[in-house]
Regions:
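Carbohydrate-recognition beta-sandwich/jelly-roll modules
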Residues: 1-285, 290
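Acidic, His- and aromatic-enriched active-site or binding-groove loops in soluble protein domains
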Residues: 293-295
């Protein structure tokens, strides 16, 4: 493990371009190797956003497994209304004084973006006075977030991490910080929505329904996420050698149908069943050749 300050040589220069101004820093020499990278921290003129870029230059001599940068913000006030937002599953808001400890290991897939640990590639922190920021990872493919919140706080620290792609860091990594005033969790979500819309990546429910009218049937339904068959392979990371009976499970389609009817009769209303592991190979095997259905 090395800190950026451990580099044998560190240089800085100011850079001025048509889009913004910032500081370019080059870090060379770690652990008697020639490994080097640069960072570019700059303010975008058009938006006022601050962009943090990490760029590999010479990857010889070190086998990098993780880069943790930018570091966590100072967010250490013991205030119930100082909150951290993460896109873990359906979304989580963590007050600084929350009694339950939260760490990266508690998050699905260690907070990896574009997974259940971070369905959208952003996190945010809001002060009680409405000041805050949203951090948007513009290169989320080999990235995620780390989080540290002790029981009862008084702080929550959150930062971005990057990992190699096919053995090397290989390409530029970028995180955009947008600073907000008079913000709440709704304002943060609207900021991200505006960000993706400006880049042509927003697809509204109305647009999706125009392509697939059955989308309209989902509105107002409760989402029930369940499975039929699971079969964890012996060479899988998730295989439990100590408890092999946990590597396989099976619930019949008839049992799932009865479960849905029972929930509905108890007043659950309109339901949408998300069914995993419905094919003979079991969850999560043989994609994309998943047929036939489980018998």
């Amino acid at each position: 493990t090395f800190a950026f300050a451990d580099a044998a040589s560190i240089t800085h220069e100011q850079r001025e371009t048509g889009t913004g101004t910032g500081i370019r820093s080059i870090f060379t020499g770690f652990g008697h190797s020639a490994y080097s990278f640069e960072t570019y921290v700059w303010v975008e003129r058009a938006s006022g956003d601050v962009l943090f870029e990490w760029i590999p230059l010479n990857e010889q001599g070190l086998n990098i497994t993780n880069v943790t940068w930018p570091a966590a913000m100072d967010f250490d006030c013991a205030d119930d209304h100082d909150t951290t937002l993460i896109t873990h599953e359906q979304g989580v808001m963590i007050p600084n004084t929350w009694p339950t400890a939260v760490s990266t290991k508690d998050i699905a897939f260690d907070g990896r973006f574009e997974t259940a640990g971070g369905y959208m590639p952003w996190f945010a922190q809001l002060r009680a006075d409405g000041h805050g920021y949203i951090a948007i990872c513009e290169t989320p493919w080999n990235a995620g977030y780390g989080i540290d919140h002790p029981s009862n706080g008084p702080y929550t620290h959150i930062n971005t991490w990057f990992e190699p792609s096919l053995g090397t860091m290989n390409y530029r990594r970028v995180v955009r910080y947008q600073f907000l005033d008079h913000a709440d969790h709704t304002a943060v979500c609207k900021a991200y929505r505006l960000y993706v819309n400006e880049r042509g990546r927003l697809r509204t429910l109305a647009e999706k329904a125009a392509r697939n009218p059955s989308v309209r049937d989902l509105i107002g339904r409760s989402w029930v996420h369940i499975g039929i068959k699971t079969k964890v392979q012996p060479d899988s990371y998730y295989y439990d050698k100590d408890h092999p009976e946990k590597n396989e499970s099976l619930v019949t389609f008839a049992q799932r149908e009865k479960q849905m009817r029972t929930l509905h009769s108890m007043g659950a209303g309109r339901l949408y069943m998300h069914l995993d592991g419905w094919a003979q190979p079991g969850y999560d095997n043989a994609h994309p050749d998943y047929l036939p259905a489980c018998q």
